Structures are given as structure tokens and as C-alpha cells.
From Swiss-Prot:
Cross-referenced InterPro entries: Cardiolipin_synthase, CL_synthase_A, CLS_N, PLD-like_dom, PLipase_D/transphosphatidylase
Keyword Repeat: yes
Gene (UniProt): clsA
Name of the protein this chain belongs to: Cardiolipin synthase A
Active site: 224, 226, 231, 404, 406, 411
Cysteine disulfide partners in this protein: none
Assigned protein family: Belongs to the phospholipase D family. Cardiolipin synthase subfamily. ClsA sub-subfamily.
Organism placement in taxonomy: Bacteria, Pseudomonadati, Pseudomonadota, Gammaproteobacteria, Enterobacterales
Catalysed reaction equations from the record: 2 a 1,2-diacyl-sn-glycero-3-phospho-(1'-sn-glycerol) = a cardiolipin + glycerol
One GO BP: cardiolipin biosynthetic process
GO CC field: plasma membrane
Species annotation: Buchnera aphidicola subsp. Acyrthosiphon pisum (strain Tuc7)
Stretches assigned to the PLD phosphodiesterase domain: 219-246, 399-426
Length: 486
């Protein structure tokens, strides 16, 4: 019996160290940044067995086999469609402002398209008004409505949007709705799913969370995009989930979520449509390529000099594209750089770029929420403050709710707006979308909004920050160790 137990112990011990060696090898060959690799290695060494389990759940970036196979196939189809889109020369804006030239050249070289013209582009900040405008657009739709959201929470104004969609589907409008399985769990447990499907709306649960699948694909890769497309002509994107801000996470005591959305008319809906079609095909296997734009889309154009690029990220999409775009935008700044983000856990490269911008004379401001829905991210963010403040960066903490907007403004000319947070999850894992907008009028509007955020914020004092309690510094360091994994 003793021999049997010794054999079992020897087998467990050998298996454990083989797993440790295998994971160590996989971490090292990935060529990721050193803090990220060190965090994983320390996790699996310091926390036996649990660390290995965490790695298998969250360490490797991959989709399920079926989705991965579809993702590889659709790019050949998408590339053919993009080649046809290039023949629509009337939609492209070839020239860009000086500050935007580098980032648009990056997008052109990697994505194959010049910036897209827009007929009309508008910034929206009031959630109630956004919902009202959206409902109006839904009722005016003539052909199709396509949506993707991370969170759809039933109740309040979200139900008004649901009713508008159902009414539109009943009058023959082709409606598609794709929602993240984890973010919209309350929606998928509600009667709305069956009601919508009975009315003719195609509802898809993206990246479905299933305990039987946790060993087949990474469970924390999420569909974080927020896109609304109507009639291949109107496009919405930004930070807003489909929730009523008066009801969403009301019990948390952090106040209303403050969001930012863009509403654009014109051929940009087509390029956003190809992203939506890729996501839809990955989930369903069905092709829904958008129609090519026509010249009528740009009649009576109000933003004649505006140029827009759409950048998408996620498994199967261009690697590091959003990260490269953010770095390019920051290094392009000459006078002023304003960053708004709810989560500030930047990569080493982004942190260095932001600090360098301040040190070469650019006025750099970062606006983050004072109140947070994530204790982990809140403390992980604080460890970067000292380095940023030392470089001359101004850090503002927004006091009137949870600032959920994600935006970057460079020299009041180049704007980046979308779903991307400055954290590892947005930069490397999730399905995200960012609009890169080269337009001075739009930039001035965004500047006014960001200034309003600043007026409702408190500035962190460098001297006071350096005198914070010692236990807080220790806690920050602990979460800094975890920051590459957040």
C-alpha cells in the first residue's frame, strides 16, 4: 500500500512540475513585455495549483475551434470585399492634417484603406437624448438595423429601445442584435429574448459562457464593441452600453455613468459594417457583407474636410493595431494631449509615450473617475500616478459619477473615440472598436466636453500625493504586480 501511495505522490509531483515547465516555456516564447511575463511566472510559482488553473483559464488568448476556423476563413472574403470598396474612390479623403498624417498612414498601410469621408458627424453626451435620437432613427429605418453591445440591461429607457426594435421588425425591417454573453447575462435571463425572436429579430449570444467550454477557449475574452448600424448609412459608436444610467448599478453608490457616443452619417457605416459582419460570421457562420456605398451618401456634405478611420481589435483581427494607433497619436502631439479613460492600467510603452509627451513640452491631462466600479483596477491605476506626476502630467479625478467615456484628443484636431480602455484587457484581449477622426470642428467639440469633465474634477496635487500613507503604497505595489493580468 505504501508503494502505491508513493507512486501516486510521485506521479502528481512529476505532473505538476511538467505543467510548470510547460507553462514557463509558453510564457517565455510569447515575447510579451517583461512585467506581463514576470506576473504570470510569479503567479504559477507562488500559488501552487491555483496559479496553474488561472493560467489555463486566462493565460492563453484563443477562441473555440469552430470560431477560430471561421475567423481564418472570413478574412479572405473580407479582403476581396475591401478590394471592391477601393473602387469607390469618391468616399476616400486622401489628405489629412499634419497631426493626423502619421496615424492615418499607419491605418492605410495596415488596413489597406484611406480615411473615409462623412456627410455629418455629431458628438452625443446626454444618455437620455442619445436614446431618444436612437429610437427616432430606429423608427425611421427603411431596410436594416444591426447592433452589438457588451451590456444590455433591461429596464427604463433600454426597454423603450427594445420596443422600437420589435415594432420595426414587425413592419419588415431586418434587425440583428448581438450581445456579449457575460455582460448581458440579465438580458438573456429575461423574457425580452423570446419576445424579440418571435417578432423576427435575430438575437445572438456572443462568446457564450458555458462551464463545459472553459477548457476549450479563454472565458475572459469579451465582445466589448458598441456599434449601431442603420440602413448602411447611419452609424453609432462610443462608450455607452444599452442601459438606463438612472438604473444601472444604482446600488453601488458611485452615481450615474457618464458616456460619450458619436453619430455619423455616410459611408463610414459601410466600413463599420464589415467589422459587424465579421463578428456575426464568427458567431453564426453566416455571411452578411454590407452593400457598397453610393455617391448619394455624400450629397450636401457638412463635414467636407473630416476624415475617419475605423480600427477593430480582437482575436482574428490585426494584431496590436489599436495599441500602435494609440502610441502614434500620443507621439504626434505637439501642443496638447487630453486622455479620458475609466481604467488606467497602461502598457509600459503607453506609459513611456505619455510621460515623454509631457517631458517634451506637451500639455498632458488625464481624466479618470474618482469613484470606481472595480476596486482592483482603482488600486492598480494609482501605482502609475507618481511616474506620471513626476513627468509633468496633470491627473484629474472626475467627481460627478463614474466617467465611462474613452477619448483621446491631440492638439484639438485628432480625436480617438470608442470602446478601448487604457488597460491590458482592452489593448490585448477584447473585441474593441476605435474611431480615429481628423476634423477641427469635431476636435473643438470634444475639447469643450473634456473641459467640462475637468471642471467637475479635482486635480491631484503632486506634493500631497507623495505624502500618502505607507499602507496605500504597499497596496498599490501589490496591485501593480497584478496589473498585467487585469
Amino acid at each position: 500500500m505504501d508503494i502505491f501511495y508513493n507512486l501516486i505522490k510521485c506521479l502528481i509531483f512529476s505532473t505538476y512540475w511538467l505543467l510548470i515547465a510547460n507553462i514557463t516555456f509558453r510564457v517565455l516564447i510569447k515575447r510579451r513585455n517583461i512585467p506581463y511575463s514576470m506576473s504570470w511566472l510569479l503567479t504559477i510559482y507562488i500559488i501552487p495549483f491555483i496559479g496553474i488553473s488561472i493560467w489555463f483559464f486566462f493565460g492563453e488568448l484563443y477562441l473555440g475551434k469552430r470560431q477560430k476556423k471561421i475567423a481564418n476563413r472570413i478574412w479572405s472574403i473580407s479582403n476581396k470585399w475591401l478590394h471592391e470598396l477601393k473602387s469607390c474612390t469618391y468616399i476616400f479623403q486622401i489628405k489629412n492634417s499634419e497631426v493626423a498624417t502619421s496615424i492615418f498612414q499607419l491605418c492605410k498601410n495596415r488596413q489597406g484603406l484611406h480615411g473615409i469621408k462623412s456627410k455629418k458627424i455629431k458628438l452625443l453626451t446626454n444618455t437620455k437624448k442619445i436614446m431618444q435620437i436612437l429610437i427616432r432613427d430606429i423608427y425611421l429605418a427603411r431596410k436594416n438595423i444591426e447592433m452589438v453591445f457588451y451590456i444590455w440591461k433591461p429596464g427604463g429607457m433600454a426597454d423603450d429601445v427594445a420596443i422600437a426594435l420589435i415594432d420595426s421588425a414587425k413592419r419588415g425591417i431586418h434587425c440583428r442584435l448581438m450581445l456579449d454573453s457575460a455582460g448581458s447575462i440579465e438580458f438573456f435571463q429575461s423574457p425580452w429574448v423570446e419576445i424579440m425572436r418571435k417578432s423576427g429579430i435575430q438575437v445572438v449570444e456572443a462568446l457564450k459562457v458555458n462551464l463545459l467550454r472553459v477548457f476549450l477557449r479563454r472565458v475572459d475574452v469579451r465582445q466589448h464593441r458598441k456599434i449601431i448600424l442603420i440602413d448602411n448609412y447611419i452609424a453609432y459608436s462610443g462608450s455607452m452600453n444599452l442601459v438606463d444610467p438612472y438604473l444601472f448599478k444604482k446600488s453601488s453608490g458611485i452615481g450615474q455613468w457618464i458616456d460619450l457616443m458619436t453619430r455619423i452619417e455616410g459611408p463610414i457605416a459601410t466600413t463599420m459594417g464589415i467589422i459587424y459582419s465579421c463578428d456575426w460570421e464568427i458567431e453564426t457562420g453566416l455571411k452578411i457583407l454590407p452593400q457598397l456605398p453610393n455617391k448619394k451618401m455624400l450629397e450636401n456634405q457638412s463635414n467636407k474636410n473630416a476624415s475617419i478611420q475605423v480600427i477593430a481589435s480582437g482575436p482574428g483581427f490585426l494584431k496590436n493595431m489599436i495599441h500602435q494607433a494609440l502610441l502614434t497619436a500620443i507621439y504626434s502631439a505637439k501642443r496638447e494631449l487630453i486622455i479620458t479613460t475609466p481604467y488606467l492600467v497602461p502598457s509600459e510603452d503607453l506609459l513611456e509615450a505619455i510621460c515623454t509627451a509631457a517631458q517634451r513640452g506637451v500639455e498632458v491631462s488625464i481624466i479618470i473617475p474618482l469613484y470606481h466600479d472595480s476596486i482592483l483596477v482603482k488600486w492598480a491605476s494609482r501605482v502609475f500616478f507618481s511616474e506620471l506626476l513626476e513627468a509633468g502630467v496633470k491627473i484629474f479625478q472626475f467627481q460627478k459619477g463614474l466617467l465611462h467615456s474613452k477619448s483621446i484628443l491631440v492638439d484639438q484636431q485628432l480625436s480617438l473615440i470608442g470602446t478601448v480602455n487604457l488597460d491590458m484587457r482592452s489593448l490585448w484581449l477584447n473585441f474593441e472598436i476605435t474611431l480615429v477622426i481628423d476634423d477641427s470642428d469635431f476636435g473643438r467639440n470634444l475639447f469643450c466636453i473634456q473641459n467640462k469633465y475637468i471642471s467637475d474634477s479635482q486635480l491631484i496635487d503632486k506634493k500631497a500625493w507623495s505624502m500618502r500613507a505607507y499602507w496605500k503604497r504597499i497596496l498599490e505595489k501589490i496591485f501593480y504586480f497584478l496589473s498585467p493580468l487585469l
